[in-house]
């Protein structure tokens, strides 16, 4: 399956790095977003993960309120059902994830991967902007000032 996915990546001709033979990951930067694609050979899936925002301090008293803003982005009236946004406590980042079934030999795989990537870039960019705006609003409400970015 790794060879199939790497072939599809090459056919898309958008500069995707091939899957690493050991980690089965492909780290890419698209429109300023770090997007990692990871194959799961057992489940026959390709997971897309996009870091939206680094978190400085989850012990900050504002974090629980900010986390509510993060989770609200999962509403179906905004984010498609095959994507989810959450907090990675290991990486201290807000991440968006999506999963795509891969069937070697399926001629539509390239189109589905391209759709997933375009969706990640669009929704990732919009989500990041919304999160930054929410963070700035929370910071203003609690301290009366906005931090310098």
Each model region followed by its residue ranges:
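Ampiphathic alpha-helical segments that act as solvent-exposed interaction surfaces
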Residues: 62-78, 99-136
